[in-house]
UniProtKB/Swiss-Prot annotation:
UniProt family annotation: Belongs to the eIF-3 subunit K family.
Entry keyword annotation includes Protein biosynthesis: yes
Domain PCI: from-to ranges: 42-204
GO MF entries: ribosome binding; RNA binding; translation initiation factor activity
Pfam family, one: CSN8_PSD8_EIF3K
GO CC annotations, alphabetized: eukaryotic 43S preinitiation complex; eukaryotic 48S preinitiation complex; eukaryotic translation initiation factor 3 complex; nucleus
Protein name, per record: Eukaryotic translation initiation factor 3 subunit K
Localization per record: Nucleus; Cytoplasm
Organism: Xenopus tropicalis
Keywords: Cytoplasm, Initiation factor, Nucleus, Protein biosynthesis
InterPro entries on file: ARM-type_fold, CSN8_PSD8_EIF3K, eIF3k, PCI_dom, Transl_init_fac_sub12_N_euk, WH-like_DNA-bd_sf, WH_DNA-bd_sf
Amino acid sequence: MASFDQMRANVGKLLRGIDRYNPENLATLERYVETQAKENAYDLEANLAVLKLYQFNPAFFQTTVTAQILLKALTNLPHTDFTLCKCMIDQAHQEERPIRQILYLGDLLETCHFQSFWQALDENLDLIDGITGFEDSVRKFICHVVGITYQHIDRWLLAEMLGDLSEPQLRVWMSKYGWMESENGKIFVCNQEENIKPKNIVEKIDFDSVSGIMASSQ
């Protein structure tokens, strides 16, 4: 099988050409989606092109490929990729399994119900078969949310939010983000006050720019 970089280059040429929405290219684009899933890579433009082709050619719709596209979009939170992809799927297909379950998982993540997300995922682990790095990508998003929300967080709560991590696993993520152990079972995330940088706006107005206004007011 061609390497991902080679496939990306080939697909990039295809998407720039007049055949961007030629249904004969669907097989190539669908293989590319599968390769992204296996190699923990991502190409939003190509994935949106697949969904657009499904819109134009409903008979060619593939539930499995669409599910992979949605799951890959979730790995790129907090960007809006998931919403973009969801809006290109008609309501009837959104009600199908596994798409319905994936949309539910996405809603839990976007509303920061992280413990509920891991519980729902645990009940549907088959959804992420073949999606390399999915869980760690989600953990990166959760750490992003924690980093902009908390100054201190309970150790047990952080472990739960990251999917009931063991102590060694939790330490790996703490080290990755530079979070320090604090007292009373808490973790120091950051000083949010230091992150608030007020912007001073200084507007310089020279005399020439107001002299006309002054003259007209006399």
